[in-house]
Amino acid sequence: MESTKQKNYVLPIAMMFALFAMISFVTGLPQPFGAIVQNEFGASNFEATLGFFANFIAFAFMGIPAGMLLQKIGYKKTALIAIVVGFVGVGIQVLSSKMGFATYVAGAFVSGFSMCMLNTVVNPMLNTLGGGGKKGNQLIQMGGSLNSVSATIVPVLVGYLMGTVVEERTIAKALPALYIAMAIFAVAFLVLFIMNIPEPSLAKANNNAKNEHSPLAFRHFKLGALAIFVYVGIEVGIPHFAGLFMMTPEAGGGLAIDSTIAGSVVGTYWFLMLIGRLVGASLGGKFTSKAMLTVASGVGILFIILAFICPITTMVSMPVFKSDISFGVAQVPISIMFMALCGLCTSIMWGGIFNLAVEGLGKYTEAASGIFMVLVC
């Protein structure tokens, strides 16, 4: 009976994995599009990042409403609404090729609503389908692996469409990437519409039991919420500030490293996150989230300490992952290498923190997922 039940979960799990990949594909678009809007609209460095920030600021507005939607209408309907919103958001970005920069930012903001809602769905659903504990963590790590693969594809795809001539970088040339995103949304909607997925939130709601508390009444959830807020800052901050430090001229206190080398080092950080998630997925069924998180955090702290104490004048030959999907070697300060290695540690932290934070929350899991998304911004 148990094996039959598990088999029935194969398609829902596969669907959640697909949604996980969709999230990073759309979330990853603003980064390569930043260079495009700079060229086409004459945007400043700050304005070029507005698409990226608009995407994540949307999480602050949509996180709690998304959690409420989960409780009220369930996982499937919430995901379907999110897919429609995402389709519209990317569609608005398509129009920006004719309607200007503000339209592009608006499209990124609307897409952010969709990404927030999908994140609110996939994380608790995978954890629930795995029964929480080790299996729940393992499924989230596997979904995270696909998330990393998709995130790797986006800049490569957009870079291929753009070519090497800077003056030819326009949204019109990048439209195929946006059309692919819209097609993915359309296919995902049709597949999810005809698929049956478990609805734990609706089953709990049918009990007509009044929610006497909120997720914030649970100490371990509050600690998890704080941890996820700090984690997101670390995960994004390490490659961002390392890249900035490498490319800043020496007069400005930086290392004045060539942008191509700096980009390869940052790309290696994200590639190591993919490797770490694949390893985490394979080990998730054998080790507890607490054990994995403890080891990853400890090693990460060690790498950061080494990055601080090692002199930046000490150079090493570091294997790097290049934007053309090849490997090479770059001469970088040893402190930068230790920062890049942190990607192995940050890789499994999201799944581990979420798994531990929602453990035992029961009917409060959906609301907890929404609160988590607010803290992502």
Regions picked out by a protein language model, each given a short descriptive name:
Residues 99, 136-196:
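Helix-loop-helix hairpin linking two adjacent transmembrane segments in secondary transporters
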Residues 105-145:
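Cytoplasmic helix-loop-helix junction between adjacent transmembrane helices
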Residues 61-102:
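Conserved MFS/SLC helix-loop-helix module at the cytosolic interface between two early adjacent transmembrane helices
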Residues 101-118, 319-349:
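Hydrophobic core of transmembrane alpha-helices in multi-pass small-molecule transporters
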Residues 50-68, 267-279:
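Central cavity-lining transmembrane alpha-helices of secondary-active solute carriers
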Residues 84-98, 299-328:
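C-terminal ends and interior cores of transmembrane alpha-helices
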Residues 30-31, 217-267:
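Extracytoplasmic gate region of multi-pass secondary transporters
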Residues 11-43, 122-123, 238-246:
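Extracytoplasmic
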